[in-house]
């Protein structure tokens, strides 16, 4: 019975339990995967085929039969890029890239925005709209953007198209970043595909460090403070005092950072163990002294994608200051919409867009040049203001209803009751200990993290294994009754 249950868990899709990096089934399967991967070390094509098949299996365990969408996008964009590269007539080249945009954004709009657009249109016209039961495939926003970056780069003649469908399928479906990023650029990843497999001791050690730290951030810090504190506050903000609501906001800021950067760390670490390099996706974003700096540090793969393929296409900063500010707001409006088909995400994106435009205006007004860093007390206050603005925006990001966000702000500004703080810490001491640890680890100097990475690299193989097992044991001890999916799975 146990073996049949295990086989069922391995081969069937359970929408209530999608496969994620922090699940026990993935950790065991990954060990088996690595063994086969190493056996195919010198057989490049067989290894690429094996990884691609495993990636499709991984996506099947996340979204069921909707893995065919991944195949559809892959096949369409592979042949579109090949045909576009051969075409010399400009308008025909443009027609091919428009077709790629239509296919990818069409799929994205149907699965993600049909109900949102229908409800919005109905409310504007006074009509009625019956919500359709449309399943949102996990990570569709990520793999469509990744595939689009390839066809757009081919259109711009920045890269040459691949000649192997297998290589392109490997690029689009590579499982470490498939369902929640980072969004990997073709120009960075494709040159690595056919390289001889080589994992240096430094790559292996850094990979282990990133997997361990990512697992700790996600499964220990993020999940625990979410289930035991943050969700309670956001679900019923009017039941709690202002100080409790504020601590809930600080908790959510840490939760979403640890959740998303934890996934990115694990993705980058797993890729390193397989011999591939991804660019960093988070760079201590809450250390930012301005909102512009924040977006250079937060979800770097998305912000750089929006910059290169949307902001610059709109004209960037080449059409005058007013146009630049408008382009920033439009880009962040669409960036907010990318996160979800809901007005709270749109509002969140607009707030960040207006803040970015205001910061650019301030830089122009004061004559400060791009890249100029503040220091000392100026930087301290810059970090403080930026962090609290980001936290303010997280309130609207987290709450689906605008009224709930206003209730939370009302509690913070009218019933603060700071005298309750010692009692709050005493009642939730485990949560506050983890929050303190999480923020401490975030704000330590970068040199400390580099030193920790070097320490893990120098550990013998047995030491690395003990470290992994210790963190896995800690995760098991602290896990909630249900596996908490990564927040960005829904995007």
Stretch-by-stretch model annotation:
Residues 5-490:
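Membrane-embedded transmembrane alpha-helical bundles that form the catalytic cores
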Residues 1-3:
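Short, small-residue-biased leader/transition segments that mark boundaries at the very start
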């Amino acid at each position: 019975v146990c073996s049949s249950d295990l086989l069922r868990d391995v081969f069937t899709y359970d929408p209530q339990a999608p496969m994620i990096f922090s699940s026990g089934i993935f950790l065991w399967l990954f060990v088996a995967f690595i063994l086969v991967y190493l056996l195919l070390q010198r057989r490049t094509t067989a290894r690429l085929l094996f990884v691609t098949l495993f990636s499709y299996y991984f996506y099947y365990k996340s979204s069921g039969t909707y893995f065919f969408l991944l195949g559809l996008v892959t096949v369409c964009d592979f042949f579109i890029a090949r045909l576009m590269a051969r075409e010399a007539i400009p308008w025909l080249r443009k027609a091919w890239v428009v077709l790629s945009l239509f296919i990818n954004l069409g799929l994205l709009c149907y699965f993600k925005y049909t109900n949102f657009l229908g409800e919005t249109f109905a409310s504007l016209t006074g009509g009625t709209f019956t919500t359709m039961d449309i399943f949102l495939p996990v990570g569709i926003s990520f793999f469509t953007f990744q595939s689009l970056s390839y066809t757009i780069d081919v259109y711009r003649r920045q890269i040459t198209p691949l000649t192997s469908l297998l290589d392109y399928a490997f690029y689009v479906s590579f499982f470490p970043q498939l369902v929640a990023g980072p969004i990997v650029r073709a120009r960075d990843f494709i040159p690595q595909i056919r390289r001889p497999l080589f994992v240096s001791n430094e790559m292996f050690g850094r990979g282990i460090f990133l997997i361990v730290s990512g697992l700790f951030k996600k499964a220990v810090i993020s999940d625990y403070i979410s289930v035991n504190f943050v969700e309670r506050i956001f679900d019923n903000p009017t039941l709690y005092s202002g100080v409790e609501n504020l601590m809930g906001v600080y908790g959510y800021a840490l939760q979403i950072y640890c959740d998303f950067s934890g996934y990115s760390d694990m993705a980058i670490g797993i890729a390193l163990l397989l011999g591939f390099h991804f660019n960093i996706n988070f760079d201590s974003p809450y250390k930012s002294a301005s909102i512009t700096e924040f977006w250079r540090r937060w979800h770097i793969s998305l912000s750089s994608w929006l910059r290169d393929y949307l902001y610059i296409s709109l004209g960037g900063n080449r059409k005058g200051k007013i146009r630049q500010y408008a382009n920033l707001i439009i880009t962040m409006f669409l960036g907010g919409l990318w996160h979800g088909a809901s007005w709270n995400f749109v509002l969140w994106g607009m707030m960040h867009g207006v803040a970015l435009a205001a910061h650019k205006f301030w830089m122009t007004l004061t004559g400060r040049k791009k890249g100029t860093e503040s220091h000392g007390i100026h930087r301290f206050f810059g970090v403080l203001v930026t962090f609290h603005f980001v936290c303010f925006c997280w309130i609207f990001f987290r709450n689906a209803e605008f009224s709930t966000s206003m209730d939370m702000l009302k509690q913070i500004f009218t019933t603060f009751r700071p005298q309750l703080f010692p009692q709050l810490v005493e009642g939730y001491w485990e949560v506050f200990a983890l929050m303190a640890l999480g923020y401490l680890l975030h704000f330590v100097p970068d040199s400390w993290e580099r030193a920790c990475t070097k320490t893990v690299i120098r550990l013998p193989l047995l030491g690395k294994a003990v470290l992994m097992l210790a963190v896995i044991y800690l995760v098991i001890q602290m896990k909630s009754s249900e596996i908490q999916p990564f927040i960005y799975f829904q995007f």
